[in-house]
Design a protein with these regions (language model features):
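Glycine-rich, flexible N-terminal cofactor/catalytic loop recognition
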Residues: 32
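Structural scaffold elements adjacent to functional motifs in cytosolic proteins
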Residues: 40-42
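Rhodanese-like catalytic fold shared by cysteine-dependent sulfurtransferases
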Residues: 2-4, 16-27, 35-38, 47-79, ...
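Hydrophobic h-region of N-terminal signal peptides that target proteins for export
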Residues: 9-17
Length: 127
C-alpha cells in the first residue's frame, strides 16, 4: 500500500511540473514497433480502444497501477511512446508521466496521435 501511495504522489508531482515530452514521428514509431524496441501507450480510453482499435502493440492505459503491472518486466531504458487523439489532445501526459514515474527514461509523445496515424494510412489493431 505504501508503494502505491508513493507512486501516486510521484505521479502527481510529475504532473504538476511536467513539461512537454519529445515528439516521435509516425515513421520512427513504426520502425521501432517493427523492431520490437518500444512500448506504446494508448491513452484514448476503453471505448475508443474497443471500437476503433489502437496502434499495433499498444497497451491500453487506464491508470498508473495497471500500467505498473503491464510494464513490470520491461527494461527502464526501453523507448516508451504515449499518444492520444491527435495534436490538440493532452491526455497522453497521463501515460507519459506514469511511465516516467515508474523509472522509464526515454519517454516520447506521438503528437500526431491516432488521428495522424490513420491519416498516414496506417492500420490499427483491435483490442
Amino acid at each position: 500500500m505504501k508503494k502505491i501511495i508513493a507512486l501516486i504522489a510521484v505521479i502527481l508531482a510529475v504532473n504538476v511540473q511536467a513539461g512537454e515530452y519529445p515528439d516521435i514521428s509516425i515513421t520512427d514509431l513504426e520502425k521501432a514497433i517493427k523492431a520490437g524496441k518500444v512500448v506504446v501507450i494508448d491513452v484514448n480510453g476503453k471505448n475508443s480502444q474497443t471500437k476503433r482499435g489502437v496502434i499495433p502493440t499498444a497497451v491500453a492505459f487506464s491508470n498508473a497501477k495497471a500500467l505498473a503491472k503491464q510494464l513490470a518486466k520491461t527494461k527502464k531504458d526501453t523507448l516508451v511512446v504515449a499518444y492520444c487523439g491527435g495534436p490538440s489532445c493532452s491526455a497522453y501526459k497521463k501515460g507519459a508521466t506514469a511511465a516516467e514515474a515508474l523509472g522509464f527514461k526515454n519517454v516520447k509523445h506521438l503528437s500526431a496521435g491516432i488521428s495522424g496515424w490513420l491519416k498516414a494510412g496506417k492500420k490499427l489493431a483491435k483490442k
